[in-house]
Amino acid sequence: MTRINTNTQKNNNTKFSKLILGVMVSSIVLSGCSATPERMEKFSYEPNYPMNIPKKTVPKNGSLYQSGDAITLFDDSRAHKVGDIITINLAENFDAKKKDEAKYDKSNQQNFGLNGQAAVGSNASVFGGNVSVPGLGSGIGIGYGSDGSFAGKSDVKQKSSLSGSIAVTVVQVISNGNLVIRGEKWITIHEGEEVIRFAGIVRPQDIRPDNTIDSEKVADVRLIYKDTGISGDTNRPGAMTQWLHKYWPL
C-alpha cells in the first residue's frame, strides 16, 4: 500500500512539473507573438481639414478691378491667419551624457560578556541559588557583527539628429498674435511607413517672407518621428530580449 501511494505522489509531481513547464513555454511564445505597441500619440486638436473657414465676401461694384481681389505693393504675404501654411526647417540636434557612481560601505560590531566566579565543574550563584554549571570558566562572551556594501555605476550616452523640412498649417491664432501650428507627413516605402508630426507655437515676426521658419524658433515643440518599416524593427530588441529585461530578476 505504501508503494502505491509513493508512485501516485511521484506521478502527480511529474504532471505538475510538466504543467509548470508548459505554462512557461506558452508565456514565452505568446510574448513573442505580441506586437510592440506603437507610440503614436494624438494631437490635442483634430486634423486641419476641412476647416470650414468662411470666405470673405466683398460686394461687387461692377468695375473691372475688384477691391477684394487687389494685392497692394506693401501687402505682407506671410502666414498670419488660420489655414495659412508655414514650412518648418528641421535642424534638431540632441546630445546628452549622464554618468552616475555610488558607493556604500557599512560595518557594525558588538561584543558583550557575563563574568562568572565559578571554576569549571563548580557551583555558580544564579538568582540567589547555587546551580552547578559544568564548563563555566571565567565568563561568557557573546559577540556579533554585520557588514554591508553597495556599489553602482551607470554611464548613459544618447545622440540624435533630425534634419529636413515639413509643411504645417496654422490652426489657431492666440490673443497675443502668436500662431499655433501643426502638421504631419506620412511616407510609405515598400512595406514600412515613416511618420513625422510637428506642433508648436510661433511668432509672426520670426516667419520669413517666404513663409519658412527654423524649428529652433518654435516654442512648445511636439516633434514625433516614427519608423514602422524594416529599419525601425532592427533598432528595437526582439520580444524574447524585452521579456528577459522585464522579468529576469538579475
UniProtKB/Swiss-Prot annotation:
Record-level GO cellular component terms: bacterial-type flagellum basal body, distal rod, L ring; cell outer membrane
Compartment(s) where it occurs, according to its Swiss-Prot or TrEMBL record: Cell outer membrane; Bacterial flagellum basal body
Spans traversing the lipid bilayer: none
PROSITE patterns with a match to the protein in the record: PROKAR_LIPOPROTEIN
InterPro entries according to UniProt: Flag_Lring
Pfam assignment, any one: FlgH
PANTHER family named in the record: FLAGELLAR L-RING PROTEIN (PTHR34933:SF1)
Protein name: Flagellar L-ring protein
Organism: Hydrogenovibrio crunogenus (strain DSM 25203 / XCL-2) (Thiomicrospira crunogena)
Taxonomic lineage of the native organism: Bacteria, Pseudomonadati, Pseudomonadota, Gammaproteobacteria, Thiotrichales
